[in-house]
């Protein structure tokens, strides 16, 4: 919300269908917030399946924002292999077309208005430094940690992450005092809170009760198993 309207924001979709239930809801919520703020959104992926995750998220969000124009308000750069090497190049190089000669649809990158506007910024700035904010939607490596270590921290760019719940404890040190990361959205619970802040009932808020009941059932089965074990042990004695 603190970003000025028209800010350039880079979103990296670094996850696969296996973690889609956790991360896709937060991706959709973030895209909605960015479109609501009239920001310029650049999507990319460091995981092969990430390009499909970004397409699905966009398809969902554009139902609410049909006035957003491809190439003007947002662009999908697609998947780029190379992991942390790509992140490092984004932090050092100043020509986006070297890394992404074309977008996901095959359009020449330099023919896209939103990219030309980005390239018109101070030529002394790296590609990453031309962005006002960077977001990693991460299910592991390559993901949030690599973006911090090889990209946003060295480049001095504001950054946040949406990640799986299993990752969050390992990433919290980077968020201490907002030194290297502006907070974390973690797992389905984090996505549900995000949807609540955005004042809509999305996939996370709809799925959370089912997850809660499943966790309760697991705990009950564990307790029941222990009770049966102790009863049988007592009978044997």
Placement of each model-derived feature along the sequence:
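Short extracytoplasmic
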Residues: 1-25
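Membrane-embedded segments
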Residues: 18-75
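Structural recognition of alpha->loop->beta junctions
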Residues: 51, 55-84, 178-194
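Membrane-proximal low-complexity regions enriched in glycine and acidic/polar residues
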Residues: 73-170
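Short, aromatic-rich amphipathic segments at membrane interfaces
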Residues: 173, 177-212
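Juxtamembrane interface at the cytosolic side of transmembrane helices
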Residues: 222-237
């Amino acid at each position: 919300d603190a970003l000025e309207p028209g800010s350039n924001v880079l979103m990296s979709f670094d996850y696969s269908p296996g973690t889609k239930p956790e991360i896709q809801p937060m991706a959709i919520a973030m895209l909605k917030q960015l479109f609501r703020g009239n920001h310029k959104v650049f999507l990319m992926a460091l995981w092969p399946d990430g390009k499909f995750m970004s397409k699905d998220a966009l398809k969902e969000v554009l139902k609410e924002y049909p006035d957003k124009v491809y190439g003007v308000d947002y662009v999908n750069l697609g998947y780029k292999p190379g992991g942390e090497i790509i992140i490092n190049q984004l932090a050092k190089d100043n020509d986006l077309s070297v890394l992404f000669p074309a977008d996901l649809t095959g359009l020449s990158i330099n023919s896209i208005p939103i990219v030309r506007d980005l390239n018109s910024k101070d030529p002394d700035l790296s590609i990453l430094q031309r962005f006002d904010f960077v977001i990693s939607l991460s299910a592991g490596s390559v993901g949030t940690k690599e973006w911090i270590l090889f990209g946003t921290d060295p480049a001095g760019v504001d950054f946040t992450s949406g990640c799986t719940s299993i990752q969050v404890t390992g990433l919290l040190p980077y968020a201490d005092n907002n030194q290297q990361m502006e907070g974390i959205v973690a797992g389905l619970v984090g996505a549900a809170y995000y949807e609540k802040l955005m004042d809509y009932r999305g996939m996370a808020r709809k799925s959370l009760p089912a997850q809660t009941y499943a966790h309760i059932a697991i705990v009950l089965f564990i307790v029941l198993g222990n009770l049966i074990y102790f009863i049988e042990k007592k009978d044997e004695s």
